[in-house]
From Swiss-Prot:
It comes from the Eukaryota. Residues 22-112 form the N-acetyltransferase domain. The gene is NATD1. Belongs to the NATD1 family. Pfam families: Acetyltransf_CG. This is Protein NATD1. It comes from Homo sapiens (Human).
Length: 113
């Protein structure tokens, strides 16, 4: 039996609960658990200087795309950059897109070319 993307339950999101982003500083990633603890969306980053992070990659499983999950990951990562007084290099195309759509001064002033 084939499973379609629409048939995948969304767990807490489906029940109207807010999306909860977790930050694992040791692994340098932000995650959202999607279906209990089995599926997750992730944003990966690395320190590339003393106070510079590279926001490298955002991945949301196909079945969960288009539901605003990546936006929550991007916001959490950029808020982390602001709160920790860091600079950010945006390797990830999605985060580049997010900043263009949300050109907040506190984000823009922290971007590295």
């Amino acid at each position: 039996m084939a499973h379609s993307a629409a048939a995948v339950p969304l767990g807490a999101l489906e029940q109207g609960c807010p999306i909860r982003v977790e930050h694992d500083r040791r692994r340098r990633q932000f995650t959202v658990r999607l279906n209990g603890c089995h599926d997750r969306a992730v944003l990966l980053y690395e320190y590339v200087g003393k106070r510079i992070v590279d926001l490298q990659h955002t991945e949301v499983p196909d079945a969960y795309r288009g539901r605003g999950i990546a936006k929550h990951l991007a916001k959490a990562a950029l808020d982390f950059v602001v709160e920790e007084d860091l600079k950010a290099h945006l390797t990830c195309w999605y985060i580049q897109k997010y900043v263009k759509e949300n050109p907040l001064p506190q984000y823009l002033e922290r971007l590295q070319p």
